[in-house]
C-alpha cells in the first residue's frame, strides 16, 4: 500500500456539503445524510441529481423531495448537565517510565509527583455512586501516571466501591490503563475477580516501543511488560486485556503491530494518533497522518477479509466504527468528557477528563461537588455547532468535533485524516452489511469475534 490510497480516501472524504456525503462502493451508489447519520442506497440518477444539488446549493430542496428532509435532530442547545456516571482517578500522579510524548509530563502533570490518598479516592467513589443512584450504572477507571505505583489504595478503593455498589444495586464496572511494568500474578487474580477492563499502553514491537516508552534510565521496558502480561492474557474470563498503541512518527507500521498483538492474545488492539504533546514532541504532522491512514485502511481491509472468513481479528478502531455507523451514532460532542465523565486529580480536583488533570481549561470542581456553572459553560462552548470548521463538515455528528484536549491545545490538524477514515469505514460497512449481516445483528462483536 502506498500513500496514494490514503490520499484517495482523503480526497473522497473532503466536505462538499455540510448536509450530505456521497459514496460509491462495489454495491452501487450511496447517500449519507448528516442529520441523523443515515445511510441510503440510491439509484444512479438520484446520485447524479444530488451531486448537482451540491453544486447548486439546493441540497435541502432535494432531500425534502425524496422524503429525508426532516428537521434537525441536534439543535444549538447545549446538553443539560447529566449525572456523573464515570470517573477516572489519577490515583498516582507519578510514573516509572519516561515516555517521549507523555501528555501527563512523565506522570506528574507538570507538578509534584504524588499519590492519591485513600480518603480522596473514597470521596470520589462516594460522589460517583451518589450521582449514579440506586439501581443505576457507573464506571470507575484508574489512570496516572502509573496507577499501580499506588496499588494498596487502588485495591482498597475497588473492594469498598464494589461492596457499596452491590448494596445499592448499582452495576459498577472497573478499568485500568497501565504501562504494564509493575503487573504481577496477584494483579491478574485481582483484576479477574473484579472483572476489570485492563488497557496496556504498548507502542509496537520491541525496537519501536523501547524508543518511545523507555524507563527514565533509558532502558527498554518491552520485555518486562510482555513477561508481566502472561498471567493476565492467560486468564481472560471476566477480565479483558487490551493494547492501546499511541501513534507517533516512530511507529507507523500499524499492520505489523496489530498482527503481533493479536497473536499475543489481546482481547482488542486499538490505535490512537498523537496530536497534542507537551512541547510538540512525537506529534503527527500531515505526512505522518497520511501514512497512518494508509496503515489504518490496510488493517481495516484485513479486518474485512477475516470477518467474512469467520475469523477473529480484534481491530478495535474498526469494530467501534462499524458499531457506531450501524446504530446511527449522532452526537454533538466527541465523548462524555465534561458531561457524564470526569477526571479526578490526586488532590481531589475534578477535571473534564483524565487529560485535563491540572489544566485550568477543564476544571470542574472537587470531589466535594461538581461546579455546575463551569460544567454548563463547558457544554455550551464545546458543542459541535460552536466549532467553526465543524459546521461545514458532513462528518460532524460522527466525529463530534474531535478530542477536546487536542483541539484546545493544537487545533484540528487531523480533519482530513478523520474524514478519510470515516469515508473508508462507511464503504466497508456497506460491504460487510451485505456479506456478514449476522455480525451486526449480534451487536456483541466488540472484538470482531463472529457469533
Where are the predicted features?
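N-terminal [4Fe-4S]-dependent radical SAM core
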Residues: 7-41, 54-88
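C-terminal accessory regions of radical SAM enzymes
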Residues: 32, 304-357, 386, 391-404
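Canonical Radical SAM [4Fe-4S] cluster-binding loop centered on the CxxxCxxC motif
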Residues: 82, 88-119
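Cysteine-centered iron-sulfur cluster-binding motifs in ferredoxin-type domains/subunits
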Residues: 91-98, 149, 338, 390, ...
Amino acid at each position: 500500500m502506498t500513500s496514494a490510497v490514503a490520499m484517495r480516501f482523503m480526497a473522497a472524504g473532503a466536505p462538499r456539503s455540510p448536509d450530505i456525503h456521497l459514496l460509491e462502493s462495489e454495491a452501487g451508489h450511496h447517500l449519507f445524510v448528516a442529520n441523523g447519520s443515515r445511510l441510503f442506497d440510491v439509484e444512479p440518477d438520484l446520485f447524479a441529481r444530488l451531486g448537482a444539488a451540491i453544486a447548486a446549493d439546493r441540497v435541502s430542496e432535494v432531500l425534502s423531495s425524496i422524503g429525508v428532509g426532516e428537521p434537525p435532530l441536534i439543535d444549538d442547545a447545549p446538553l443539560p448537565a447529566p449525572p456523573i456516571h464515570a470517573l477516572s482517578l489519577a490515583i498516582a500522579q507519578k510514573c516509572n517510565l519516561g515516555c517521549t510524548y507523555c501528555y501527563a509530563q512523565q506522570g506528574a502533570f507538570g507538578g509534584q509527583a504524588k499519590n492519591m490518598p485513600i480518603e480522596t479516592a473514597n470521596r470520589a467513589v462516594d460522589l460517583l455512586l451518589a450521582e449514579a443512584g440506586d439501581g443505576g450504572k457507573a464506571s470507575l477507571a484508574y489512570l496516572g501516571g502509573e496507577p499501580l505505583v499506588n496499588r494498596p489504595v487502588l485495591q482498597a478503593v475497588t473492594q469498598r466501591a464494589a461492596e457499596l455498589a452491590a448494596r445499592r444495586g448499582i452495576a459498577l464496572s472497573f478499568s485500568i490503563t497501565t504501562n504494564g511494568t509493575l503487573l504481577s500474578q496477584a494483579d491478574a487474580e485481582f483484576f479477574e475477580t473484579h472483572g476489570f477492563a485492563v488497557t496496556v499502553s504498548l507502542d509496537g514491537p520491541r525496537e519501536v516501543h523501547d524508543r518511545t516508552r523507555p524507563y527514565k534510565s533509558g532502558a527498554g521496558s518491552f520485555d518486562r511488560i510482555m513477561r508481566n502480561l502472561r498471567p493476565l492474557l492467560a486468564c481472560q474470563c471476566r477480565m479483558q486485556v487490551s493494547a492501546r498503541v499511541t501513534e507517533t512518527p516512530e511507529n507507523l507500521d500499524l499492520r505489523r503491530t496489530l498482527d503481533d498483538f493479536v497473536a499475543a492474545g489481546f482481547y482488542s488492539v486499538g490505535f490512537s494518533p498523537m496530536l497534542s504533546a507537551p512541547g510538540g514532541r512525537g506529534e503527527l504532522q500531515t505526512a505522518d497522518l497520511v501514512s497512518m491512514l494508509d496503515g489504518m485502511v490496510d488493517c481495516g481491509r484485513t479486518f474485512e477479509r477475516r470477518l467474512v472468513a469467520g475469523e477473529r481479528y480484534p481491530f478495535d478502531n474498526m469494530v467501534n466504527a462499524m458499531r457506531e455507523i450501524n446504530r446511527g451514532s449522532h452526537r454533538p460532542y466527541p465523548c462524555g468528557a465534561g458531561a457524564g465523565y470526569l477526571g479526578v486529580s490526586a488532590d481531589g480536583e475534578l477535571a473534564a477528563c483524565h487529560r485535563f488533570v491540572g489544566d485550568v481549561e477543564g476544571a470542574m470542581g472537587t470531589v466535594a461537588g461538581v461546579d455546575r456553572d463551569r460544567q454548563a459553560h463547558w457544554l455550551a462552548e464545546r458543542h459541535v455547532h460552536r466549532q467553526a470548521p465543524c459546521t461545514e463538515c458532513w462528518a460532524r455528528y460522527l466525529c463530534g468535533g474531535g478530542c477536546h484536549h487536542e483541539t484546545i491545545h493544537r487545533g484540528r490538524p487531523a480533519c482530513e485524516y478523520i474524514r478519510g477514515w470515516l469515508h473508508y469505514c462507511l464503504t466497508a460497512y456497506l460491504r460487510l452489511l451485505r456479506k456478514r449481516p449476522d455480525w451486526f445483528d449480534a451487536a456483541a462483536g466488540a472484538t470482531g469475534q463472529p457469533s
